[in-house]
Swiss-Prot record:
Domain of life, per lineage: Bacteria
A GO MF label: ABC-type vitamin B12 transporter activity
Keyword Cell division annotated: no
Gene: cobD
The protein's name in its UniProt record: Cobalamin biosynthesis protein CobD
Topology class, membrane: Multi-pass membrane protein
Organism: Desulfotalea psychrophila (strain LSv54 / DSM 12343)
Protein backbone atom coordinates (compact mmCIF):
# COMPACT_ATOMS: atom_id res chain seq x y z
CA UNK A 1 0.00 0.00 0.00
CA UNK A 2 2.87 2.38 0.79
CA UNK A 3 4.35 1.80 -2.66
CA UNK A 4 1.04 2.70 -4.30
CA UNK A 5 0.94 5.99 -2.37
CA UNK A 6 4.47 6.89 -3.46
CA UNK A 7 3.68 6.11 -7.09
CA UNK A 8 0.44 8.09 -6.80
CA UNK A 9 2.40 11.15 -5.68
CA UNK A 10 4.67 10.79 -8.72
CA UNK A 11 1.72 10.38 -11.08
CA UNK A 12 0.01 13.45 -9.58
CA UNK A 13 3.08 15.51 -10.35
CA UNK A 14 3.31 14.10 -13.88
CA UNK A 15 -0.23 15.24 -14.64
CA UNK A 16 -0.69 18.32 -12.45
CA UNK A 17 2.74 19.81 -11.91
CA UNK A 18 2.65 22.84 -9.63
CA UNK A 19 -0.49 24.89 -10.42
CA UNK A 20 0.12 28.60 -9.86
CA UNK A 21 -3.09 28.85 -7.84
CA UNK A 22 -1.94 26.14 -5.41
CA UNK A 23 -0.48 27.42 -2.10
CA UNK A 24 2.80 25.60 -2.63
CA UNK A 25 4.60 24.63 0.62
CA UNK A 26 8.01 25.49 -0.84
CA UNK A 27 6.90 29.10 -1.27
CA UNK A 28 6.02 29.14 2.43
CA UNK A 29 9.46 27.72 3.21
CA UNK A 30 11.01 30.51 1.15
CA UNK A 31 9.13 33.12 3.17
CA UNK A 32 10.32 31.50 6.40
CA UNK A 33 13.93 31.56 5.21
CA UNK A 34 13.68 35.28 4.47
CA UNK A 35 12.11 35.99 7.87
CA UNK A 36 14.73 34.04 9.83
CA UNK A 37 17.56 35.64 7.85
CA UNK A 38 16.22 39.11 8.66
CA UNK A 39 15.84 38.09 12.30
CA UNK A 40 19.33 36.65 12.85
CA UNK A 41 21.54 38.91 10.71
CA UNK A 42 21.30 42.00 12.94
CA UNK A 43 21.32 39.98 16.17
CA UNK A 44 24.24 37.57 15.62
CA UNK A 45 27.64 39.16 15.06
CA UNK A 46 29.24 36.34 13.09
CA UNK A 47 27.50 35.65 9.74
CA UNK A 48 28.38 31.96 9.81
CA UNK A 49 26.59 31.37 13.11
CA UNK A 50 23.67 33.51 11.99
CA UNK A 51 23.40 31.16 9.02
CA UNK A 52 23.59 28.08 11.23
CA UNK A 53 20.76 29.41 13.40
CA UNK A 54 18.71 30.20 10.30
CA UNK A 55 19.11 26.64 9.01
CA UNK A 56 18.19 25.14 12.38
CA UNK A 57 15.20 27.44 12.81
CA UNK A 58 13.79 26.75 9.34
CA UNK A 59 14.12 22.98 9.72
CA UNK A 60 12.60 23.07 13.20
CA UNK A 61 9.70 25.17 11.96
CA UNK A 62 9.02 22.82 9.02
CA UNK A 63 9.09 19.68 11.16
CA UNK A 64 6.99 21.17 13.98
CA UNK A 65 4.45 22.54 11.50
CA UNK A 66 4.07 19.12 9.89
CA UNK A 67 3.83 17.46 13.31
CA UNK A 68 1.00 19.78 14.36
CA UNK A 69 -0.69 19.42 10.96
CA UNK A 70 -0.77 15.63 11.07
CA UNK A 71 -1.75 15.60 14.75
CA UNK A 72 -4.80 17.71 13.92
CA UNK A 73 -5.65 15.41 11.01
CA UNK A 74 -5.75 12.45 13.41
CA UNK A 75 -9.33 13.39 14.36
CA UNK A 76 -10.43 12.51 10.83
CA UNK A 77 -10.59 9.06 9.20
CA UNK A 78 -7.13 7.64 8.32
CA UNK A 79 -7.73 8.11 4.60
CA UNK A 80 -7.69 11.89 5.12
CA UNK A 81 -4.20 11.70 6.63
CA UNK A 82 -3.03 9.46 3.79
CA UNK A 83 -4.44 11.83 1.19
CA UNK A 84 -2.81 14.87 2.81
CA UNK A 85 0.55 13.09 3.05
CA UNK A 86 0.41 12.07 -0.62
CA UNK A 87 -0.44 15.66 -1.61
CA UNK A 88 2.48 17.02 0.40
CA UNK A 89 4.83 14.45 -1.11
CA UNK A 90 3.61 15.31 -4.60
CA UNK A 91 4.57 18.96 -4.09
CA UNK A 92 8.20 17.99 -3.41
CA UNK A 93 8.87 16.44 -6.83
CA UNK A 94 9.14 18.48 -10.01
CA UNK A 95 8.93 16.20 -13.03
CA UNK A 96 6.30 18.08 -14.99
CA UNK A 97 7.60 21.56 -14.23
CA UNK A 98 11.15 20.58 -15.19
CA UNK A 99 9.88 19.21 -18.48
CA UNK A 100 7.60 22.19 -19.07
CA UNK A 101 10.33 24.79 -18.58
CA UNK A 102 13.07 22.93 -20.45
CA UNK A 103 10.80 21.99 -23.34
CA UNK A 104 9.79 25.65 -23.68
CA UNK A 105 13.44 26.32 -24.52
CA UNK A 106 13.41 23.35 -26.92
CA UNK A 107 10.34 24.61 -28.77
CA UNK A 108 11.76 28.11 -29.04
CA UNK A 109 14.91 26.67 -30.60
CA UNK A 110 13.21 24.43 -33.16
CA UNK A 111 10.67 27.11 -34.09
CA UNK A 112 13.45 29.56 -34.87
CA UNK A 113 12.59 32.08 -32.16
CA UNK A 114 15.09 34.91 -31.75
CA UNK A 115 17.87 34.19 -29.28
CA UNK A 116 16.95 36.96 -26.78
CA UNK A 117 13.55 35.35 -26.22
CA UNK A 118 15.10 31.89 -25.91
CA UNK A 119 17.65 33.21 -23.42
CA UNK A 120 14.84 34.63 -21.28
CA UNK A 121 13.14 31.22 -21.24
CA UNK A 122 16.42 29.62 -20.20
CA UNK A 123 16.96 32.21 -17.45
CA UNK A 124 13.85 30.85 -15.72
CA UNK A 125 15.61 27.58 -14.92
CA UNK A 126 19.34 28.37 -14.61
CA UNK A 127 21.39 30.53 -12.28
CA UNK A 128 24.02 31.62 -14.80
CA UNK A 129 23.92 34.75 -16.94
CA UNK A 130 22.19 33.98 -20.24
CA UNK A 131 22.42 37.32 -22.07
CA UNK A 132 25.33 36.34 -24.33
CA UNK A 133 24.77 32.61 -24.81
CA UNK A 134 24.74 31.33 -28.37
CA UNK A 135 22.51 28.50 -29.60
CA UNK A 136 24.80 25.55 -28.59
CA UNK A 137 25.43 27.12 -25.18
CA UNK A 138 21.68 27.48 -24.60
CA UNK A 139 21.14 23.81 -25.42
CA UNK A 140 24.06 22.78 -23.23
CA UNK A 141 22.83 24.82 -20.26
CA UNK A 142 19.33 23.36 -20.61
CA UNK A 143 20.56 19.77 -20.70
CA UNK A 144 22.80 20.44 -17.70
CA UNK A 145 19.94 21.82 -15.61
CA UNK A 146 17.73 18.87 -16.59
CA UNK A 147 20.40 16.47 -15.36
CA UNK A 148 21.06 18.35 -12.13
CA UNK A 149 17.37 18.84 -11.36
CA UNK A 150 16.65 15.17 -11.95
CA UNK A 151 18.91 14.54 -8.96
CA UNK A 152 17.96 17.30 -6.53
CA UNK A 153 14.43 18.08 -7.70
CA UNK A 154 13.04 14.58 -8.22
CA UNK A 155 15.21 11.69 -7.02
CA UNK A 156 16.45 13.27 -3.77
CA UNK A 157 12.99 14.00 -2.29
CA UNK A 158 11.82 10.51 -3.25
CA UNK A 159 14.97 9.01 -1.75
CA UNK A 160 14.48 10.77 1.58
CA UNK A 161 10.78 9.98 1.59
CA UNK A 162 11.43 6.26 1.28
CA UNK A 163 14.48 6.35 3.58
CA UNK A 164 12.64 7.97 6.49
CA UNK A 165 9.58 5.77 6.03
CA UNK A 166 11.71 2.80 7.05
CA UNK A 167 11.69 4.12 10.63
CA UNK A 168 7.90 4.47 10.82
CA UNK A 169 7.35 1.29 12.91
CA UNK A 170 9.97 2.41 15.44
CA UNK A 171 8.38 5.85 15.81
CA UNK A 172 4.78 4.67 15.75
CA UNK A 173 4.00 6.92 12.78
CA UNK A 174 2.33 6.04 9.49
CA UNK A 175 4.93 5.39 6.81
CA UNK A 176 3.44 7.80 4.28
CA UNK A 177 3.34 10.55 6.92
CA UNK A 178 7.02 10.09 7.75
CA UNK A 179 7.75 9.94 4.01
CA UNK A 180 6.15 13.33 3.47
CA UNK A 181 8.07 14.78 6.42
CA UNK A 182 11.33 13.41 5.00
CA UNK A 183 10.68 14.81 1.54
CA UNK A 184 9.52 18.19 2.83
CA UNK A 185 12.52 18.49 5.17
CA UNK A 186 14.79 17.79 2.22
CA UNK A 187 13.00 20.48 0.18
CA UNK A 188 13.61 22.92 3.02
CA UNK A 189 17.33 22.11 2.91
CA UNK A 190 17.45 22.40 -0.88
CA UNK A 191 15.51 25.68 -0.86
CA UNK A 192 17.86 27.14 1.74
CA UNK A 193 20.81 26.25 -0.47
CA UNK A 194 19.09 27.86 -3.47
CA UNK A 195 18.44 31.07 -1.54
CA UNK A 196 21.48 31.30 0.72
CA UNK A 197 24.20 29.13 -0.81
CA UNK A 198 25.85 31.78 -2.97
CA UNK A 199 29.60 32.37 -2.94
CA UNK A 200 29.34 36.15 -2.97
CA UNK A 201 30.22 38.63 -0.24
CA UNK A 202 26.74 38.60 1.30
CA UNK A 203 26.37 34.83 1.58
CA UNK A 204 29.85 33.27 1.53
CA UNK A 205 29.72 32.87 5.34
CA UNK A 206 26.01 33.18 6.09
CA UNK A 207 25.04 30.53 3.53
CA UNK A 208 27.84 28.07 4.23
CA UNK A 209 25.83 25.87 6.60
CA UNK A 210 22.92 25.67 4.15
CA UNK A 211 25.25 24.79 1.28
CA UNK A 212 27.10 22.09 3.24
CA UNK A 213 23.88 20.54 4.52
CA UNK A 214 22.52 20.44 0.97
CA UNK A 215 25.75 18.77 -0.23
CA UNK A 216 25.29 16.09 2.41
CA UNK A 217 21.58 15.60 1.69
CA UNK A 218 22.28 15.16 -2.03
CA UNK A 219 25.40 13.00 -1.74
CA UNK A 220 23.75 9.60 -2.10
CA UNK A 221 20.75 10.67 -4.26
CA UNK A 222 23.10 12.25 -6.83
CA UNK A 223 25.08 9.06 -7.17
CA UNK A 224 21.93 6.94 -7.34
CA UNK A 225 20.68 9.26 -10.08
CA UNK A 226 23.87 8.87 -12.10
CA UNK A 227 23.77 5.08 -11.83
CA UNK A 228 20.09 5.16 -12.79
CA UNK A 229 20.93 7.18 -15.91
CA UNK A 230 23.65 4.68 -16.82
CA UNK A 231 21.22 1.78 -16.39
CA UNK A 232 18.55 3.51 -18.50
CA UNK A 233 21.17 4.22 -21.16
CA UNK A 234 21.73 0.50 -21.58
CA UNK A 235 18.01 -0.32 -21.40
CA UNK A 236 16.54 2.45 -23.58
CA UNK A 237 18.89 2.62 -26.54
CA UNK A 238 21.30 5.34 -25.46
CA UNK A 239 25.08 4.97 -25.28
CA UNK A 240 25.37 2.89 -22.11
CA UNK A 241 29.11 2.15 -22.32
CA UNK A 242 29.85 5.84 -22.90
CA UNK A 243 27.55 6.87 -20.03
CA UNK A 244 29.47 4.57 -17.67
CA UNK A 245 32.85 5.71 -19.01
CA UNK A 246 32.11 9.43 -18.69
CA UNK A 247 30.47 8.96 -15.29
CA UNK A 248 33.62 7.30 -13.94
CA UNK A 249 35.98 9.76 -15.62
CA UNK A 250 34.28 13.15 -15.27
CA UNK A 251 31.93 12.96 -12.27
CA UNK A 252 34.26 15.07 -10.13
CA UNK A 253 34.93 17.62 -12.89
CA UNK A 254 32.42 20.06 -11.45
CA UNK A 255 32.36 22.87 -8.91
CA UNK A 256 29.58 21.01 -7.08
CA UNK A 257 30.45 17.77 -5.26
CA UNK A 258 27.17 16.23 -6.48
CA UNK A 259 25.94 17.83 -9.72
CA UNK A 260 28.78 16.37 -11.78
CA UNK A 261 27.60 12.80 -11.24
CA UNK A 262 24.26 12.92 -13.08
CA UNK A 263 25.57 15.44 -15.61
CA UNK A 264 28.51 13.18 -16.49
CA UNK A 265 26.26 10.16 -16.95
CA UNK A 266 23.83 12.20 -19.05
CA UNK A 267 26.60 13.63 -21.23
CA UNK A 268 27.90 10.14 -21.92
CA UNK A 269 24.45 8.74 -22.63
CA UNK A 270 23.81 11.45 -25.24
CA UNK A 271 27.36 11.49 -26.72
CA UNK A 272 27.75 15.21 -26.00
CA UNK A 273 29.99 17.55 -24.02
CA UNK A 274 28.57 19.67 -21.19
CA UNK A 275 29.75 22.38 -18.78
CA UNK A 276 32.83 24.50 -19.50
CA UNK A 277 33.26 28.21 -18.60
CA UNK A 278 30.07 30.00 -17.53
CA UNK A 279 29.16 33.51 -16.39
CA UNK A 280 27.48 34.05 -13.00
CA UNK A 281 26.55 37.57 -11.85
CA UNK A 282 28.93 39.07 -14.39
CA UNK A 283 31.90 36.91 -13.37
CA UNK A 284 33.38 34.13 -15.52
CA UNK A 285 33.54 30.83 -13.63
CA UNK A 286 36.01 28.39 -15.15
CA UNK A 287 34.51 24.91 -15.09
CA UNK A 288 36.02 21.83 -16.75
CA UNK A 289 34.19 20.22 -19.63
CA UNK A 290 32.28 17.02 -18.95
CA UNK A 291 31.91 14.36 -21.63
CA UNK A 292 33.23 13.84 -25.15
CA UNK A 293 31.84 15.80 -28.08
CA UNK A 294 31.23 12.74 -30.22
CA UNK A 295 28.76 14.85 -32.19
CA UNK A 296 27.44 18.40 -32.23
CA UNK A 297 24.90 19.21 -29.54
CA UNK A 298 21.39 19.82 -30.91
CA UNK A 299 17.94 20.84 -29.61
CA UNK A 300 16.68 17.26 -29.62
CA UNK A 301 19.14 16.54 -26.80
CA UNK A 302 16.79 18.50 -24.52
CA UNK A 303 13.90 16.22 -25.47
CA UNK A 304 16.01 13.10 -25.05
CA UNK A 305 17.24 14.32 -21.65
CA UNK A 306 13.63 14.66 -20.49
CA UNK A 307 12.90 11.15 -21.73
CA UNK A 308 15.81 9.87 -19.65
CA UNK A 309 14.45 11.81 -16.66
CA UNK A 310 11.11 10.02 -16.86
CA UNK A 311 12.61 6.55 -17.25
CA UNK A 312 15.18 7.12 -14.50
CA UNK A 313 12.55 8.43 -12.10
CA UNK A 314 10.41 5.32 -12.37
CA UNK A 315 13.38 2.94 -12.33
CA UNK A 316 14.89 4.42 -9.17
CA UNK A 317 11.50 4.79 -7.47
CA UNK A 318 10.86 1.09 -7.97
CA UNK A 319 14.36 0.21 -6.75
CA UNK A 320 13.98 2.39 -3.64
CA UNK A 321 10.66 0.72 -2.86
CA UNK A 322 12.12 -2.73 -3.46
CA UNK A 323 14.99 -1.95 -1.09
CA UNK A 324 12.50 -0.79 1.53
CA UNK A 325 10.49 -3.99 1.13
CA UNK A 326 13.62 -6.11 1.58
CA UNK A 327 14.45 -4.23 4.80
CA UNK A 328 10.99 -4.04 6.33
CA UNK A 329 8.82 -6.58 4.53
CA UNK A 330 6.22 -3.80 4.12
Amino acid sequence: MFSIKILLAIILDLFLGDPSCYPHPVRCIGLAINRWEKFYRPRVAQPFWAGVLTVCSVLTLVILTLAVFFTLLAIFPPIVTDFAAVLLLYTTVAIKDLKKESMAVYRALIQGEDLPKTRKLLARIVGRDTENLDRPAIIRATVETVGENLADGIIAPLFWAVALSIFAPLLGVKAIVLASVGAMSYKAINTMDSMLGYKNERYILFGRAAARLDDWANWLPARCTALGIVAISFMAGYNGPQAWKIFKRDRYQHTSPNAGHPEAALAGALNIRLCGPSVYFGNIVEKPYIGNALRAIEPDDIRQANRIVLFTTFLLSLLFLLFRFVLTGL
